């Protein structure tokens, strides 16, 4: 049986910049075997694209709601995307 591969884009709001959110997201995504990227947005939010097995992506989405210890997440918006061509999980600048 083929694994259920999905790609989701998440936009995380709250106190999520300057608290190590991107670095923690990359570490968490890598530990879950996911590929994609994470970046800061000019308006103070963080945006992430994650692709992999549905169960693992769901775990990352749940983690987004908490984030690293210094983060204060107020909202996580998630949209399903078409599969990308990611080879790793990167921090975009």
Curated annotation (Swiss-Prot):
Give the catalysed reaction(s), semicolon-separated.
an acyl phosphate + H2O = a carboxylate + phosphate + H(+)
Q: Which residues form the Acylphosphatase-like domain?
A: 7-93
Q: List UniProt keywords, sorted A-Z.
A: Hydrolase
What is the enzyme's main class?
hydrolase
EC nos: 3.6.1.7
Residues forming the catalytic site: 22, 40
Q: Name the SUPFAM superfamilies for this protein.
A: Acylphosphatase/BLUF domain-like
**NCBIfam families from the xrefs?**
PRK14426.1, PRK14442.1
Instruction: Tell me the gene name.
Output: acyP
Instruction: Specify whether 4Fe-4S is a keyword of the entry.
Output: no
- Which InterPro entries did the record assign? Acylphosphatase, Acylphosphatase-like_dom, Acylphosphatase-like_dom_sf, Acylphosphatase_CS
Q: A single Pfam family, by name?
A: Acylphosphatase
| Database matches in PROSITE patterns | ACYLPHOSPHATASE_2, ACYLPHOSPHATASE_3
Taxonomic source organism: Acaryochloris marina (strain MBIC 11017)
Family named by the database record: Belongs to the acylphosphatase family.
* GO MF term list: acylphosphatase activity
State the Gene3D superfamilies in the record. Answer: 3.30.70.100
Q: What is the name attached to this protein's record?
A: Acylphosphatase
Signal peptide positions on this chain: none
């Amino acid at each position: 049986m083929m694994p259920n591969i999905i790609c989701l884009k998440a936009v995380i709001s709250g106190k999520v910049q300057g608290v190590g959110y991107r670095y923690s997201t990359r570490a968490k995504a890598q530990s879950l075997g996911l590929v994609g990227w994470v970046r800061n947005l000019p308006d103070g939010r963080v945006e992430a694209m994650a692709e992999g097995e549905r169960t693992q992506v769901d775990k990352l989405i749940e983690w987004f709601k908490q984030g690293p210890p210094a983060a204060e997440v107020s909202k996580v918006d998630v949209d399903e995307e078409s599969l990308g061509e990611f080879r790793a999980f990167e921090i975009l600048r």
